[in-house]
Amino acid sequence: MKDERHKVSSFFIFCIGSYKGFLTTITKIKKLENIKSVCVYCASSTKIDKAYFEAANQLGKLLAEKNIRIINGAGCQGLMAAVSNSALEAGGKVTRVIPHFMVEQGWNHTGLTQTIETETMHERKNLMAEMSDAVITLPGGCGTLEELLEIITWKQLGIYLKPIVILNINGYFTPLLEMLEKAIAQNFMRPEHVKLWEVANSPEEAVHLLYSIPLWNKEFRKFAAI
């Protein structure tokens, strides 16, 4: 996957040569040095391969060791619970953001550091983004995919400017990444939009990328449309 990512990066550099405004702006961008909180999107399913749970446990532990607070959807099972529990066991902090109706259904993790309840799903997602210095996405179902694509769209529009890392465990996100590359190839997206996200193959790589991805810039919204 690293070789594939390098090819995409080379393709990106080649294709945007004519976008002088974009290149001028990107050289001025700074990288995050002090990351205090990371939003983690992931599955609530308990019936998935253990490799996903191992990655979730390791990610929670790594973030806690770096004193990075985790912001998540407060799930009491699946990868959400795995990330939260491993972070707490390592001395970390976890803030849950969850709508009232999910609390009423008993879907919330009750042992987290901080609880924030919202009225709607949209309010929940907006608050999670506002509170975070970056996003890491582990594999998940429709909810996770919706959250990931929405935050990528917000970054494309200059609303969310911070790092987005896709943690591609077991090649789970490879079909999605190929679809996004196809969207670029067929002019549904611009070539430079490939830099809206980065791909990691391990929790260690995902955390490392947080500190190496340039912050996006609101000026890039001029490139949002084809």
Task: Cite the ranges covered by each PLM segment.
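Serine residues within intrinsically disordered or low-complexity segments
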Residues: 9-10, 18
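Arginine/glycine-rich "motif VI" loop of SF2 helicases in the C-terminal RecA-like domain
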Residues: 88, 154-162, 188-190
